[in-house]
Regions:
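A short beta-strand-turn-helix
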Residues: 2-18, 46
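A generic, residue-level signal for flexible/boundary positions that often mark functional hotspots
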Residues: 4-5, 22, 91, 159, ...
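Alpha-helical scaffolding within the catalytic cores
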Residues: 5-6, 38-41, 134
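Flexible, active-site-adjacent loop/turn segments at secondary-structure boundaries
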Residues: 8-9, 32, 89, 163
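Short clusters of hydrophobic/aromatic residues that line enzyme substrate/ligand-binding pockets
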Residues: 10-11, 97, 165
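Structural alpha/beta surface segment adjacent to cysteine/selenocysteine redox centers
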Residues: 16, 21-107, 112
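C-terminal cap of thioredoxin/glutaredoxin-like
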Residues: 37, 103-174
Length: 174
């Protein structure tokens, strides 16, 4: 189901002809490098111009720990309409995250603290986070980051199949 994206995890126009899906972990060094060097160029050239819709999917590399907690924090921020500010804040830490800092990040981006704390402490989005990881595994990804290029309307076809791109690739390869 290529239309079942979480609205808070999408950048770009819904009618963009191409969708780029990233499977990533907030603690992954290569994912941080993509965020710092490739993402700004992709956003300026393709997403902001309406050519590509960008979808972020969680792929924490472990079943517990700070990577999972960061994914939960981003989803809880998304529940308050602030997914991308939390996403950017987490990646701006350069992969050096500590679970004790997430509630402070929530405050700095203007989240309602009680609702965020309840969501975070109850790990409300854990199941969907692990579903993202299973989906990445079905695409053949066993590490992060991984990307899928796919037609936005109608999904892949025999003539225009989805393209899986494993690993951190430079901007020029997109």
């Amino acid at each position: 189901d290529y239309d079942g994206f979480y609205a808070s995890e999408v950048h770009g126009r819904a009618d963009a002809p191409i969708t780029l899906i990233e499977y990533s972990d907030f603690t992954c060094g290569w994912c941080v490098k993509f965020f710092q060097t490739t993402w700004p160029r992709l956003q300026a050239k393709y997403i902001d111009t309406g050519k590509v819709r960008f979808v972020y999917r969680d792929y924490p590399r472990a079943d517990q720990g700070v990577g999972v907690e960061a994914a939960v924090a981003s989803r809880c921020a998304g529940a308050q309409g602030k997914y991308w500010p939390m996403h950017d804040r987490l990646f701006s830490q350069g992969g050096r995250l500590d679970s004790g800092l997430f509630k402070g990040y929530a405050k700095t981006i203007g989240l309602e603290q009680v609702a965020f704390a309840k969501c975070f402490d109850e790990r409300q989005y854990l199941e969907s986070i692990f579903q993202d990881r299973q989906e990445a595994n079905r695409w053949g990804f066993h590490g992060t980051p991984g990307f899928i290029l796919i037609r936005t309307v109608g999904g892949p076809t025999e003539k225009e199949p989805a393209i899986a791109i494993p690993g951190a690739v430079p901007f020029e390869d997109f």
